[in-house]
Amino acid sequence: MEILLLTRDDCAFCHDAEEILDRLSTEYGVSVRTLDVDTPEGQQLAERGGVMFPPGIFVDGRPFSYGRPSERKLRRELEKHLGRVGKT
């Protein structure tokens, strides 16, 4: 599983997203790739995924969120993808 973070240097919420994803990547063992939204590839992904402003988060190539990240929602999404929901 890969998480893609579309970011920008002057974006405060992007720094929050990086901190959240650092924690979750360690906890869940997922790969995180960061891409500047102002690059041609970043612009193309943002447009395709409906990312209006950074940070934009994609989970396995699918748009998940943009703007201020929610660690709780992202954690639930990772658990769903990894098959951990409802298991003890």
Which residue stretches match the model-derived regions?
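Generic recognition of short, well-ordered alpha-helical segments
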Residues: 15-19, 44, 69
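Short, structurally constrained coil/turn elements
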Residues: 26-28
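Local sequence-structure signature of Cys/Sec-based thiol-disulfide redox active-site neighborhoods
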Residues: 1-24
